[in-house]
Amino acid sequence: MKPPQRRRKVPARYTGEATGPTAWSPREMRHLLRLLQARRGQPEPDAKELAKELRGRSEAEICRFIQQLKGRVVREAIRKVQPGGRDGPRHRETQLPAPIEVWMDLAEKLTGPLEEALTAAFSQVLTIAAAEPLSLLHSKPGKPTKACGRALVFLSTQDAQKDPAPEGSGPEPMTAADPTPEASVPEPKASGTNPETSGLVPEVSVPDPDAPTESLAGSSTERDFAVDFEKIYKYLSSSSRGGHGPELSAVESAVVLNLLMSLAEELPHLPCTALVDHLTKTYAQLTAPQASLDREKRPRPGTEDGGTDSTGPEETGQGSPQASEPTEPRLTWKAAGVCPLNPFLVPLDLLSQALAPAR
């Protein structure tokens, strides 16, 4: 037969333990509200007096509940003054934007739906740079290549280690057709070698080149001190698109870190005065009021007055994000004469190092 139903009781070992602060009942909250309203003139309510009126509540519980009420009042006040909180539109309008935020906002308006295409193009540039012969030759151990008309063929690492002077084979990969380029290293056939790039090779040195390859410690050391510029370019390419690149060695990580740290040192070498003048004029053209330029929208871009240079980018910045058809921004870019890869029309001469004045 089924045993009779019995009610389960709380074990005795749990009866003496405190289960935490009990929730405030609506009756207690109304009572506390009446007590606080009666003491409205006081700067701070006294917890001792409130504990005498509220039976069953300690001073700590009353203080904790009052702090919760204060925090709720502050949140409600902020929500009324600033809709959306600190991320709301009113808070963003009252704050003065940083210069980089101004340029980022302008670039987003100019590029419109082409942001993914720009990111892919930047990644492709780094991918192409990974196969440059100079990048392969300046690696440690070097990667001499032979031009066979269709693609670059990478030699094995063992053949690359036999090369006596990889820095001397700088002009080799463009014209060498011998399958064993190590023997024909002294014959430079290509023209236009850069002596500055060939001087970069001695900076990266492999420790103990005469060490036996059989030892595991020696091979791990050579692996840590190996520099593969192809891998570095692939790492930068994948990082620009938010992906995971190949794992870099210790020296390769140091090269990437040195590149990042040298950005601040390279900025003063640019023609800063010319850059400032160009960007100031470009910003003035792109942010020109559109009301006065609406009449110039209908005629073709090449009119007599010089106002069309600012009309094109402005139409692009205002019209392309709101365009419903995907072909609309392309026509706008074509009419404006602005390259999406260079929306601010910065000349390439302004991105190179300025010539030092002759003394």
Swiss-Prot record:
One Pfam assignment: SNAPC2
Main location: nucleus
Comp. bias regions, Polar residues: 308-325
Basic residues biased stretches: 1-11
Extent of Basic and acidic residues compositional bias: 293-303
InterPro entries: SNAPC2
Entry's localization field: Nucleus
Record GO terms (molecular function): RNA polymerase II general transcription initiation factor activity
Assigned keywords, A-Z: Nucleus, Transcription, Transcription regulation
Region annotated Disordered, chain positions: 1-25, 158-222, 287-331
Entry GO terms, CC: cytosol; nuclear body
GO BP terms: snRNA transcription
Function description: Part of the SNAPc complex required for the transcription of both RNA polymerase II and III small-nuclear RNA genes. Binds to the proximal sequence element (PSE), a non-TATA-box basal promoter element common to these 2 types of genes. Recruits TBP and BRF2 to the U6 snRNA TATA box.
Subunit comment: Part of the SNAPc complex composed of 5 subunits: SNAPC1, SNAPC2, SNAPC3, SNAPC4 and SNAPC5. SNAPC2 interacts with TBP and SNAPC4.
Protein name: snRNA-activating protein complex subunit 2
Record organism: Rattus norvegicus
Gene, per the UniProt record: Snapc2
